């Protein structure tokens, strides 16, 4: 397994001095090089399990075996069926224009990248440290 995933799950930094977060919703994003192959459709998802790698679908299925409820990250609005053909804005302008052969580079669809690599973890502001550690261990086991 990758040495990266032998470490604990890391939190995003926040201003401890000037904020009082409640951590009611915890999400994670899998590094691109640690993702196994995954395809998500409207209703189903498929993946190919690989040693040292995982994906949101595999992690969610594994958590469910332990009666721990997670869910996929919310699908970006511009990918919802009702809005799929509408324009959306990126740093580079209209995200729908990225297939134009005359535009160099194209735009990065950050929302879809987060959707493909992210998931919402079992979350509750009353979770104990022991429960959190159990979730972390389950997630780490997916990368073995």
Set out the residue ranges of the language-model regions.
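PLP-dependent aminotransferase class I/II
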Residues: 2-144
């Amino acid at each position: 397994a990758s040495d990266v995933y032998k470490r604990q799950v890391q939190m995003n930094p926040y201003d401890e001095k000037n904020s009082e977060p409640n951590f009611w919703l915890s999400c994670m994003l899998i590094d691109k090089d640690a993702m196994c192959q995954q395809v998500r459709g409207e209703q189903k998802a498929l993946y190919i399990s690989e040693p040292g790698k995982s994906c949101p679908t595999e992690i969610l299925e594994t958590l469910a075996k332990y009666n721990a409820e997670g869910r996929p990250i919310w699908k970006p609005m511009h990918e919802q069926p009702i809005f799929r053909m509408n324009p959306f804005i990126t740093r580079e302008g209209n995200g729908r224009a990225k297939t134009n052969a005359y535009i160099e580079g194209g735009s990065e669809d950050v929302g879809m990248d987060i959707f493909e690599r992210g998931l919402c973890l079992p979350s509750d502001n009353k979770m104990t440290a022991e429960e959190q550690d159990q979730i972390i261990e389950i997630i780490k086991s997916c990368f073995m």
